[in-house]
């Protein structure tokens, strides 16, 4: 394979992995520990 193809596939895999992990943190079990700043400051 060409080095550019390998680099493109690796970069795409990293981007997909980071996106999947951020979705997991936002909506998965760890999201229970996230604080909502709008709920902290009631006016």
Swiss-Prot record:
Pfam families: PsbN (PF02468)
Entry-linked InterPro entries: PSII_PsbN
Keyword set includes Thylakoid: yes
One GO cellular component, as annotated: plasma membrane-derived thylakoid membrane
Subcellular locations according to the entry: Cellular thylakoid membrane
Main location: membrane
Leader sequence residues: none
Residues spanning the membrane: 7-29
Record function comment: May play a role in photosystem I and II biogenesis.
UniProt name for this protein: Protein PsbN
Organism encoding this protein: Thermosynechococcus vestitus (strain NIES-2133 / IAM M-273 / BP-1)
């Amino acid at each position: 394979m060409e080095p550019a193809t390998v680099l493109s596939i690796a970069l795409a895999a990293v981007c997909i992995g980071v996106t999947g992990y951020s979705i997991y943190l936002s909506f998965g079990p760890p999201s229970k520990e996230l604080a909502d700043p709008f709920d902290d400051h009631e006016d």
